[in-house]
Every structure is written in structure tokens, then in C-alpha cells.
């Protein structure tokens, strides 16, 4: 039987008077299992970058898990994300859940000079990212040739101390199939 976790989405707002780290500390005090931070490059108000904010939250808390909700795969190279995840998980004492998604805000792709992704690209990219992450986390060297991403004898060292859970933010039959086959939630 699966465990049921309760979490709180912490706003990544950088507007004056906001304090996402204080919000995360309060969630921990209240007994929440995780805090999540959404991943958008810009919005209607000033915002912190997700990965940096999660690192800050992990350093300021001691028990609560941290989750990018969800890290848009097309914004970052999956092998680099796997290394970032291993590092944050290790430094936080094993509290990372890696949330991944295909990215849906096409205006963010354009605004930041990222190549546009079709729905097929977004689903394929999530699947390839999971295969790459799990490969570099478990193999001494990992080579992968996908439709969108590749690695050549990539190494992530040290290896994760435990299996890092991967959650996907998806919709649509094909993406839900990837969730069922490869993800932990």
C-alpha cells in the first residue's frame, strides 16, 4: 500500500513582503510532508528561480521534503538536472522528490530563447529525462541516444545515497502512460 503525503505549494514570489522560506518553515512546523515550488521562468510578478529557492528552503528546514512542481524538462539538460538532483538530495539529507514536466507555457520558451516544443517533444523529453537520470544515478558511465537528448559516458558522482523519487506532472493518455511506466508518482 502506498503512503499518502500532504504538501503545500510555496509561492516563488520575489515581491516585497513575501518570504517563501518562512512559508516552508511554517509548513514544516505544521507537519506537512513536503513543500513544492512551481517552475516558471517569468510570470505576472517577480519570482525566484525554482532550483535555487528549493536549495534555500532545504537549508532552512530539517525534515520536510522539497519538490519542484514540476521542473520543466525543456528548460534544462536532463543529465545536468540529474547531477543537480543528486547534489540537492545529498545536501538535504535525502529530502528531494524530483518533480518533472514537459513545460506548457510556450511564451516562456520564446521569451528565453528556448526551442519551441511540440506536445510529442514534451512527452518524449520527460521519458528521456527519466531514463537519463536513472541511468547516470545507477551506472558508472551512462551513454544514451534519444530523439531529443543524448549523453556520452556521462558520470554522476557521488551516486545518490538512495533512490530519488520522480513524480511527473502530466495530462493526456500518452503522458499518463509514461507516468505509469516510469515515474513514482
Residue ranges and their predicted role:
Residues 44, 68-76:
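Active-site nucleophile and cofactor-binding loops and adjacent substrate-binding regions
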Residues 47-69, 125-132:
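Alpha-helix-loop-beta-strand connector modules within alpha/beta enzyme cores
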Residues 25-29, 54-63, 85, 89-96, ...:
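Acidic (Asp/Glu)-rich catalytic clusters
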Residues 2, 77-182:
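Internal, glycine-rich beta/alpha segment that forms the wall or movable "lid"
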Amino acid at each position: 500500500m502506498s503512503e499518502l503525503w500532504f504538501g503545500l505549494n510555496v509561492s516563488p514570489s520575489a515581491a516585497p513582503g513575501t518570504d517563501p522560506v518562512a512559508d516552508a518553515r511554517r509548513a514544516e512546523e505544521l507537519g506537512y510532508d513536503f513543500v513544492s515550488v512551481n517552475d516558471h521562468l517569468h510570470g505576472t510578478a517577480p519570482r525566484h528561480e525554482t532550483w535555487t529557492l528549493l536549495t534555500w528552503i532545504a537549508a532552512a528546514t530539517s525534515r520536510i521534503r522539497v519538490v519542484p512542481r514540476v521542473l520543466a524538462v525543456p528548460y534544462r539538460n536532463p543529465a545536468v538536472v540529474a547531477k543537480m538532483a543528486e547534489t540537492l538530495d545529498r545536501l538535504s539529507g535525502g529530502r528531494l522528490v524530483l518533480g518533472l514536466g514537459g513545460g506548457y507555457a510556450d511564451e516562456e520558451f520564446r521569451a528565453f530563447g528556448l526551442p519551441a516544443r511540440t506536445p510529442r517533444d514534451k512527452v518524449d523529453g520527460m521519458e528521456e529525462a527519466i531514463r537519463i537520470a536513472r541511468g547516470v544515478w545507477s551506472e558508472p558511465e551512462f551513454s544514451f541516444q534519444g530523439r531529443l537528448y543524448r549523453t556520452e559516458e556521462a558520470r554522476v558522482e557521488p551516486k545518490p545515497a538512495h533512490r530519488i523519487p520522480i513524480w511527473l506532472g502530466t495530462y493526456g493518455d500518452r503522458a499518463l502512460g509514461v507516468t505509469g511506466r516510469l515515474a513514482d508518482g
